[in-house]
């Protein structure tokens, strides 16, 4: 999927079934390395990143069958250095490191997804594993790690909140000797889901979802069954789709509790929202959104993965809105494409200022990443005219059947 034709002037209404969380499913798949037991995992989304992760596991010797529900047997792992051509495709491949070290005492991987030390906090992963007793050598963009005997439990104070590093340390500590405490840990729902999965296999983890996670190491893990949580970012994206188009939507098979901050902002924008056990209903019919001031923050704050979508919402809102990005650098690249579509946006340091206009215009735009792809497609749906969105190959990394789901609620999107 390289290029999409998107027809504008659409009001998006209807029902959407939310897929499983990519950000929970990916690490959970890599956590299966920790056990020889047979595992069954449900609600796995069909995404390119997931498929690459499965190829990585199979390369290591893991046996996998099934589709949305996977049966996994990691008892025959016999390779500890995955190939560069797979590791380089997804940043999430860093999560192979902790489980391989914990179970086998050795691992060798290339730096994932073209990451550079310092640009994304890969160094936090390595520092955490070093504190657990691993010896790590970094040379020629390759991480060579080993430990004599078992990893050793430790009190680890994270210098910066990091979802990825919290996952790496938590997974490695499950088989360490003694107890590990991760202080200043990430609190995301995905962390809670991963801990729940590991505990199902026999791990002893308490405190996931708080800033302090305690892991009592065990000798080995067993098999088990787990259902991956719904994707809160996909849910939020569809809610914004309806809000920006002045439509109404019901998202099914989702978890409202994971979206408290997003729902608060949508309500502030003027949407009527109702929630149930596993559904969210949004109604913005006949109302132009009000502008919002947003600052991204670690969970339970406003998610960085939703700021591009809300920039679109601010672009067509009444008033002037701001979005301040505190998690990642260079996350406003997409704004130049919204400006092509008529949006009035100014960038000042790590903040964008959106001067709301009534209507965007169609254009030929280029997406720079996963969330930008979704945002520009939504922009095309509500703009006047036909928009061509290029470089949409990013989309299938994190959204399952996104154009198809949008078409079911009133969009007209075609693959060119």
Curated annotation (Swiss-Prot):
Keywords of this entry: Cell cycle, Cell division, Cell shape, Cell wall biogenesis/degradation, Cytoplasm, Peptidoglycan synthesis, Pyruvate, Transferase
Pfam families: EPSP_synthase (PF00275)
Its EC number(s): 2.5.1.7
Catalytically driven reaction(s): phosphoenolpyruvate + UDP-N-acetyl-alpha-D-glucosamine = UDP-N-acetyl-3-O-(1-carboxyvinyl)-alpha-D-glucosamine + phosphate
The protein's enzyme class: transferase
Amino acids binding phosphoenolpyruvate: 22-23
Catalytic residues (UniProt): 115
Gene Ontology MF, one: UDP-N-acetylglucosamine 1-carboxyvinyltransferase activity
Record-level GO cellular component terms: cytoplasm
InterPro entries (UniProt xref): Enolpyruvate_Tfrase_dom, Enolpyruvate_Tfrase_sf, MurA_subfamily, RNA3'P_cycl/enolpyr_Trfase_a/b, UDP_GlcNAc_COvinyl_MurA
Location(s), subcellular: Cytoplasm
GO biological process, one term: cell wall organization
Annotated residues for binding of UDP-N-acetyl-alpha-D-glucosamine: 91, 120-124, 305, 327
PTM annotation (2-(S-cysteinyl)pyruvic acid O-phosphothioketal): residues: 115
Primary location class: cytoplasm
Pathway: Cell wall biogenesis; peptidoglycan biosynthesis
Similarity remark: Belongs to the EPSP synthase family. MurA subfamily.
Cited function: Cell wall formation. Adds enolpyruvyl to UDP-N-acetylglucosamine.
HAMAP family, alphabetized: MurA (MF_00111)
Protein name per Swiss-Prot or TrEMBL: UDP-N-acetylglucosamine 1-carboxyvinyltransferase
Gene that encodes it: murA
């Amino acid at each position: 999927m390289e290029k999409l034709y998107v027809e504008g002037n659409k009001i998006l209404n209807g029902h959407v079934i939310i897929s499983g969380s990519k950000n929970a499913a990916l690490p959970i798949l890599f956590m299966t390395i920790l056990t020889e037991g047979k595992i069954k995992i449900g609600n796995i989304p069909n995404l390119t990143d997931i498929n690459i992760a499965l190829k990585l596991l199979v390369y290591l010797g893991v046996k996998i069958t099934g589709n949305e529900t996977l049966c996994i047997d990691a008892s025959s792992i016999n390779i500890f250095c995955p190939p560069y051509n797979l590791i380089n495709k997804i940043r999430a491949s860093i999560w192979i490191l902790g489980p391989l070290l914990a179970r086998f005492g050795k691992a060798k991987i290339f730096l994932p997804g073209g990451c550079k030390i310092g640009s994304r906090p890969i160094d936090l992963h390595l520092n955490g594993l070093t504190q657990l007793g691993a010896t790590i050598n970094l040379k020629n963009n390759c991480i060579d790690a080993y430990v004599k005997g078992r990893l050793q439990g430790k009190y680890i104070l994270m210098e910066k909140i990091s979802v990825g590093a919290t996952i790496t340390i938590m997974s490695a500590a499950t088989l360490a000797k003694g107890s590990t405490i991760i202080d200043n840990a990430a609190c995301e729902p995905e962390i809670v889901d991963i801990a729940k999965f590991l505990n199902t296999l026999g791990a002893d983890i308490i405190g996931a979802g708080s800033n302090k996670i305690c892991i009592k190491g065990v000798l080995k893990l067993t098999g088990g069954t787990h259902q991956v949580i719904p994707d809160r970012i996909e849910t939020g994206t569809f809610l914004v789709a309806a809000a920006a188009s002045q439509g109404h939507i019901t998202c099914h098979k989702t978890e409202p509790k994971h979206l408290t901050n997003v729902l608060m902002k949508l309500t502030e924008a003027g949407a009527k929202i109702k929630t149930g056990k596993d559904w969210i209903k949004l109604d913005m019919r006949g109302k132009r959104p009000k502008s919002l001031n947003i600052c991204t923050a670690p969970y339970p704050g406003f998610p960085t993965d939703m700021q591009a979508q809300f920039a679109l919402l601010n672009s067509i809102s009444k008033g002037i809105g701001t979005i301040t990005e505190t998690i990642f650098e260079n996350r406003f690249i997409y704004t130049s494409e919204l400006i092509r579509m008529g949006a009035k946006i100014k960038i000042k340091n790590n903040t964008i200022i959106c001067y709301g206009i009534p209507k965007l215009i169609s254009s030929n735009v280029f997406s720079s990443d996963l969330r930008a792809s979704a945002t520009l497609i939504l922009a095309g749906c509500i703009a006047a005219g036909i928009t061509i969105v290029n470089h949409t190959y990013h989309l299938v990394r994190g959204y399952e059947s996104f154009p198809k789901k949008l078409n079911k609620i009133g969009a007209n999107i075609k693959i060119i």
